UniProtKB/Swiss-Prot annotation:
GO terms for biological process: cysteine biosynthetic process; hydrogen sulfide biosynthetic process; sulfate assimilation. The gene is cysI. One of its GO terms (molecular function) is sulfite reductase (NADPH) activity. InterPro entries: CysI, NiRdtase/SiRdtase_haem-b_fer, Nit/Sulf_reduc_fer-like_dom_sf, NO2/SO3_Rdtase_4Fe4S_dom, NO2/SO3_Rdtase_4Fe4S_prot, NO2/SO3_Rdtase_4Fe4S_sf, NO2/SO3_Rdtase_FeS/sirohaem_BS. Alpha(8)-beta(8). The alpha component is a flavoprotein, the beta component is a hemoprotein. Its cofactor is siroheme; [4Fe-4S] cluster. It comes from Psychromonas ingrahamii (strain DSM 17664 / CCUG 51855 / 37). [4Fe-4S] cluster binds at residues 426, 432, 471, 475. HAMAP family: CysI (MF_01540). This is Sulfite reductase [NADPH] hemoprotein beta-component. It comes from the Bacteria. It catalyses: hydrogen sulfide + 3 NADP(+) + 3 H2O = sulfite + 3 NADPH + 4 H(+).
Length: 562
């Protein structure tokens, strides 16, 4: 007997191509929330329903419903915006969100937090009509925001991978008019709608796509379902290696869930990229599991059906045969903070945004300062998959002015360490409903403690790739870090060790459910050993494996939990 489909499949089937009862829910002023089915559907429109968890207990005591609000994630393939768009993004954050911030994300876009239901349509309409930005398919069981290498040194090649990311994004958008009808007061469609790529039930689960320019792995290919790795010959992109089946999300206590590195299917010509993307997506649509949400990502489809079957299906659907993979190498993935001169002779300033949170802080008015830069900047802005921002294409004549403005508001801070630049956290508490522990609010202090340990052991100029998430879904990609912390309960985390600096190895759990004091005590001991016993140039992740502190993950489905 076949297993029962997960209830989310019913919701999608009954939704009339993602409409549900959202219009009725918007007009219901008795609550700040949507009905349960529609809470799932709004994700496809780029929204997550949340409540402020710091206020839950007090509101319950006062017999009030939770303080519901919404997160909106913008669709911004490749993460590029103009100064005019950034000014509108800033204005909307200030006028229509409770948080008042712009949150850069690991998906190379931005989020708004704290949008009350009464303001949702206004935010959608202001974004679309004033900034020409939408949030279609940035969440839900679909292809999410397509991300690409943002390092601006090779300007012409970056332009090409950015162009492909936008083309893939456009091709994998829905045909349904539901978004325009509900949020933009668009005309209703009366004829029967079709979704040729997604069908009525969309994909089994989220699907993430990247376009990558080696040697930079800033997008973390092994966190994604589909990756196109550019192969460059004679300074031109001649095609792509196609990597399929990466993903990091796990479930605490469920050893049938595991992170997985993507498999290299082979090489394709550049002109075949869209057909291959469509074939991979539709293969996952038809072969992916729909009974268990925790086993529905592409990585499990490959484990269940085998790489060769999945690959053969992609070749059959696309009519394209994979050629042998071409050689490439990833050597780094962190953003190069500071000024870089591109091949286009223009300057690009990468500024560090701690946790990606653009807001005016006491003595550090990042948000206001960015507005002042946008008013005079002649190039564009590029968001990175490491939650930072590139002020791109600055002419030599404007460089001094841009630097002065960036320093004035704290966007350039020479006191920041390499450790801080290489640390990252998800949002977690107080707004994320899945968070089991702090992440964004915990990270700054944790980094200060780790900086002190590095200095104590005489290696203050070195760094460890450190990432923290409040739950095991992995938004900040801790399972590709040298040190990953995954929230287990308030103030308690699972500690993972053994990833590497270029993002090509998964870490393994070293200690389970430890508190913050135990984390620092453990890191003190490990950093001390690393400082004293490492080989020349040996990174922390390589050291803990060579020293047999932790075993290397070879095949995650077999040895990640051992």
């Amino acid at each position: 007997m076949s297993k029962k489909l997960h209830d989310n499949e019913r919701i999608k089937i009954e939704s009339n191509f993602l409409r549900g009862k959202l219009v009725e829910g918007l007009n219901d002023n008795t609550t700040g929330a949507f009905i349960p089915d529609d809470v799932q559907l709004v994700k496809f429109h780029g929204l997550y329903q949340q409540d402020h968890r710091d206020y839950r207990a007090e509101r319950k005591k006062q017999k009030l419903e939770p303080l519901y609000s919404f997160l909106l994630r913008a669709r911004l393939p490749g993460g590029v915006v103009t100064p005019q768009q950034l000014l509108e993004i800033d204005r909307i954050a200030s006028e229509l969100t409770d948080a008042g911030s712009i949150r850069l994300t690991t998906r190379q876009t931005f989020q708004y937090h704290g949008i009350y239901k009464r303001n949702l349509k206004s935010v959608f309409q202001e974004l679309k009509f004033k900034a020409n930005i939408d949030s279609i398919f940035t969440a839900g069981d679909v292809n999410r925001n397509v991300i690409c290498t943002s390092n601006p040194m090779q300007s012409e090649l970056h332009a090409e991978v950015y162009d492909w990311s936008t083309k893939i994004s456009e091709m994998l958008l829905p045909h349904s008019n539901a978004f325009a009808e509900i949020w933009l007061d668009g005309e209703k469609v009366h004829e029967t709608e079709q979704e040729p790529i997604y069908g009525e039930t969309m994909l089994p689960r989220k699907f993430k796509t990247t376009v990558v320019l080696p040697p930079f792995n800033d997008v973390d290919v092994h966190a994604n379902d589909l990756n196109f790795v550019a192969i460059v010959e004679n300074e031109k992109i001649v095609g792509f290696n196609v990597l399929v089946g990466g993903g990091l999300g796990i479930t605490h206590g469920d050893k049938t869930t595991f992170p997985r590195k993507a498999d290299d299917f082979g090489f394709i010509a550049a002109e075949d990229i869209l057909e291959i993307a469509k074939a991979v997506v539709t293969t996952q649509r038809d072969l992916g599991g729909r009974t268990s949400r925790s086993h529905a990502r592409t990585k499990y489809t490959l484990e269940t059906h085998g790489v060769e079957k999945f690959k053969g299906e992609v070749e059959s659907r696309s009519g394209i045969k994979f050629l042998p993979s071409r050689p490439y190498e990833f050597t780094e993935r962190g953003d190069r903070i500071g000024w870089i001169k591109g091949t286009d002779k223009k300057w690009h300033l990468t500024v560090f945004i701690e946790n990606g949170r653009i807001l005016d802080y006491p003595g550090k008015p990042l948000k206001s300062g960015l507005v002042e830069i946008a008013k005079v900047h002649q190039g564009d802005f590029r968001m990175t998959a490491n939650q930072n921002l590139i002020i791109a294409s600055v002419p030599e004549s404007e460089k001094e002015k841009i630097e002065a403005l960036a320093r004035k508001c704290g966007l350039i801070n020479d006191a920041h360490s390499k450790q801080r630049f290489n640390s990252m956290a998800c949002v977690a508490l107080p707004t994320c409903p899945l968070a089991m522990a702090e992440a964004e609010r915990y990270l700054p202090g944790l980094v200060t403690d780790v900086e002190a340990l590095l200095t104590k052991h005489g290696i203050g100029d070195d760094h460890i790739i450190l990432r923290v998430t409040g739950c095991p879904n992995g938004c900040a990609r801790p399972l590709l870090a040298e040190v990953g912390l995954i929230g287990k309960a308030p103030g308690r985390y699972n500690l993972y060790l053994g990833g590497n600096t270029n993002g090509t190895r998964l870490p393994k759990m070293y200690k389970e459910n430890i508190d913050e004091a135990a984390i620092i005590m453990t890191m003190d001991e490990l950093i001390g050993r690393w400082a004293n016993e490492r080989e020349s140039g040996e990174c922390f992740g390589d050291f803990v494996i060579r020293a047999a502190i932790i075993a290397e993950v070879i095949i995650a489905s077999k040895d990640f939990h051992d």
